[in-house]
Amino acid sequence: MELTITGSGKGISVSDAAFAKDFNEALVHQVVTAYMAAGRQGTKAQKTRSEVSGGGKKPWRQKGTGRARAGTIRSPIWRSGGVTFAAKPRDFEQKVNRKMYRAAMRSIFSELVRQERLVVVDDMNVDTPKTKAFTAKLSDLGVSNALILSENVEQNLHLASRNVPHVDVRDVAGLDPVSLVAFEKVVVTVPALKKIEEMLG
């Protein structure tokens, strides 16, 4: 298939295997969910009654006081007691094999093309590390909420873009499925597009 390069009017030929697949919503959902789950910290920890400090001595005798029987001051029903079903650190990672991940990425890119959310440009580099220069370039493309994909993120582009809201600049190595679906547009340079095609085609 052929994609139009915005600004030049030329076309670029890309593989149907990478950019013209059917949208597999279930697979994309699974991969996106797994990616987000893997990013969870998972360090929450609480103490059970056996882990809370103290409580070794019986607070009062079993019978004769008129009070409810108690064996430890660290019972879950007591203030400062342990937690009944205490949360423990856990790993939320879900297994997604390489074949599934690539298929999901092909599916996402194909859907971006169908929805006309993939914008191909010759390059996104700016001459100076000024936000004004970068926003002018975005304005020319008619985008305000976008993921910018470049083969290599140059220093000027990185500095000029980092203070712009709703815009993220990545190189191809930093590409992930969540970012692709999170932004309204995905602006990709021709060298980056070729690299993505090589990865997915």
UniProtKB/Swiss-Prot annotation:
It comes from the Bacteria. GO terms for molecular function: rRNA binding; structural constituent of ribosome. Belongs to the universal ribosomal protein uL4 family. InterPro entries: Ribosomal_uL4, Ribosomal_uL4-like, Ribosomal_uL4_dom_sf. GO terms for biological process: translation. Residues 39-70 are annotated as: Disordered. Keywords: Ribonucleoprotein, Ribosomal protein, RNA-binding, rRNA-binding. This is Large ribosomal subunit protein uL4. Coiled coil: none annotated. Part of the 50S ribosomal subunit. It comes from Marinobacter nauticus (strain ATCC 700491 / DSM 11845 / VT8) (Marinobacter aquaeolei). SUPFAM superfamilies: Ribosomal protein L4 (SSF52166). GO terms for cellular component: ribonucleoprotein complex; ribosome. One of the primary rRNA binding proteins, this protein initially binds near the 5'-end of the 23S rRNA. It is important during the early stages of 50S assembly. It makes multiple contacts with different domains of the 23S rRNA in the assembled 50S subunit and ribosome. Forms part of the polypeptide exit tunnel.
